[in-house]
A protein has these predicted regions:
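N-terminal, charge-rich interaction modules
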Residues: 12-49, 55
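Short, Lys/Arg-enriched N-terminal segments with co-localized hydrophobic residues
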Residues: 3-15
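Conserved Class I S-adenosyl-L-methionine
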Residues: 110-129
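A short, conserved alpha-helix within the catalytic core of class I
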Residues: 77-83
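Conserved beta-strand signature within the Rossmann-like core of class I S-adenosyl-L-methionine
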Residues: 93-101
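A short glycine-rich, Lys/Arg-flanked "PGG" loop and its adjoining helix->strand segment in the class I
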Residues: 83-92
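Class I S-adenosyl-L-methionine
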Residues: 26, 124-155
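Short acidic low-complexity segments
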Residues: 55-66
């Protein structure tokens, strides 16, 4: 499968993703008790401990019953290969965030909003939110449609 990355910082600087001033943890919907997997996160990616709610648990795939997956990806091929496998690890009300490089980032990619959206929709999920993860990465949130949620693995 894909590798894990990312870290936590205790530097005291809050990761204010994008331009809204809202901490990333809040933007992507991390709540108390969430089970989260960071997949292919860049080595310099971090959440500040003070922005995380209590009892958040970071786990490694192939863990199941995940509330949030944040998947960093640079190629359409990798996204197509791993999207459905990762989405199958979600709880019925879980979400998968796909993070791909912004055009302005200088990071090589063949992904765009339209390609990311198409792959997610083709996998049976629906996109419901977009955000700036940071100065390099855009993120698109996918969830299962309400009518499909009873058939998804539950906690």
């Amino acid at each position: 499968m894909v590798s894990l990355g990312g870290k936590f910082s205790d530097s005291g600087d809050t990761n204010m993703a994008g331009y809204s001033g809202t901490p990333l943890a809040k933007k992507i919907g991390i709540k108390e008790g969430s089970r989260i997997a960071l997949v292919n996160a860049p080595k310099d990616f971090q959440f500040e401990p003070k922005e995380l709610p209590d009892n958040v648990k970071f786990v490694k795939p192939p863990a199941k019953s995940l509330d949030i997956i944040l998947f960093f990806v640079t190629t359409e091929r990798a996204l197509t290969k791993d999207f459905s496998k990762l989405a199958a690890r979600l709880t019925a009300n879980g979400m998968i965030w796909i993070a791909w490089p912004k055009k302005s980032s200088g990071v090589a990619t063949d992904l765009s909003f339209e390609r990311v959206q198409r792959i997610g929709l083709d996998a049976g999920l629906v996109d419901v939110k977009i955000c700036a993860v940071d100065d390099t990465w855009s993120g698109l949130k996918f969830v299962y449609r309400l009518k499909d949620r009873p058939s998804v693995n539950k906690k």
